[in-house]
Design a protein with these regions (language model features):
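Conserved kinase catalytic-core segment
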Residues: 108-109, 159-209
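Short, solvent-exposed loop/turn and secondary-structure capping segments
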Residues: 58-64, 111-113, 192-197
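Conserved ATP-binding subdomain of kinase catalytic cores across diverse folds
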Residues: 63-164
Length: 209
């Protein structure tokens, strides 16, 4: 028991060192409560997942209803202009806009999202298509697929989420999240890569993801 516990503590320590140094000029790592004085609950970051084996690892927490149609024709809107990964914005026949990330890490991002969700961490809807049909100025043709993230009216992006200063710094779910990112070799922990969403439920209540 003791050797295993020692190993776990070492992993957490390495994670903390890695996290503290991932950005040269990053702010101090500390708990940071909302300026408006609103109460923060741990379940805004993590909830007990219950029976992990029952989780949908194909379509994720938002299910098949929010997934992109692999048989639809997607109309080109614009190319991705931020970041190093290739991609584009497209719109499907239902009028839903999709952010398509076509880099090699696209399917990895979806896989990580499924694992995090299965372990109780909130995740926005993301999906993967190996290819899709695109309509652009070249006509209608097959296009390389990637990570598909929908722009839905019930999900409002309200800003970046800071790794260094948030209400969950120091909690076990937060530390476990860092350890899992180390296991996935996810070193690109820029705050600009993490969006905070407000989800409006059907009953009118809201939650942050």
């Amino acid at each position: 028991v003791t050797p295993l516990r020692t190993k776990v503590l070492r992993v957490v320590a390495v994670g903390a060192t890695f996290f503290a140094s991932f950005e040269f000029c990053a702010p101090a790592v500390k708990p940071f409560l909302p300026r408006d004085g609103s109460q923060v609950h741990l379940d805004q970051l993590w909830v007990d997942p219950g029976d992990v084996a029952s989780r949908d690892m194909v379509y994720g927490p938002w299910g098949r209803a929010h997934a992109p149609d692999p048989k639809a024709v997607y109309t080109f809107v614009r190319s991705k202009v931020h970041g190093a990964s290739p991609g584009m914005t497209v719109v499907d026949p239902r009028g839903i806009k999709w952010s398509v990330k076509q880099s090699t890490e696209g399917p990895v991002e979806v896989m990580q999202s499924r694992i995090f969700s299965a372990l109780g961490y909130h995740q926005p809807p993301v999906y993967y298509l190996p290819s899709f049909t695109l309509k652009d100025d070249k006509g209608v043709h097959e296009e390389r697929g990637g990570r598909f993230r929908p722009s839905l009216p019930e999900f409002e992006e309200i800003g970046d989420w800071s790794w260094q200063q948030n209400p969950f710094v120091g909690t076990k779910p937060y530390q476990a999240l860092l350890v899992m990112l180390l296991m996935f070799n996810s070193a690109d922990l820029k705050n600009s890569n993490n969006s905070l969403y407000e989800h409006r439920r059907a009953d009118g209540t809201t939650e942050r993801l």
